[in-house]
Amino acid sequence: MDGRCIFSSIDLKTMEFYKVVPKDLDGIVSQLRITKGVECAIFLYQTKTLEYKVSLRSNGKVDVAAIASYFGGGGHVRAAGCTMQGTVHDCVNNLSEQIEKQLIKAE
């Protein structure tokens, strides 16, 4: 995706160690999105074993609502979210496939 998409994640063990709650994570995905050259940002945090809450942000070239909807979530073109099952790598790979399709379509 040529650096047009950025992702970050935090696992449950790290959240527990630092006493982080989901509210503490508000805004991280938006900060990722403003990285120069990034058109789509993904932030995942683990809620239980093999389950992640996913936040997606876009500059508009990627319809993150469509991506979230594909995975059972919802939102708006520029801001959306969903819950996914699997490892963080599985989640990112599955999201990346959908983002890549949209980036190709937008060109």
Segments the model singles out, each with a brief description of its role:
Residues M1-Y70, G75-E107:
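Hydrophobic helix-and-loop "lid/oligomerization" segment in the mid-to-C-terminal part
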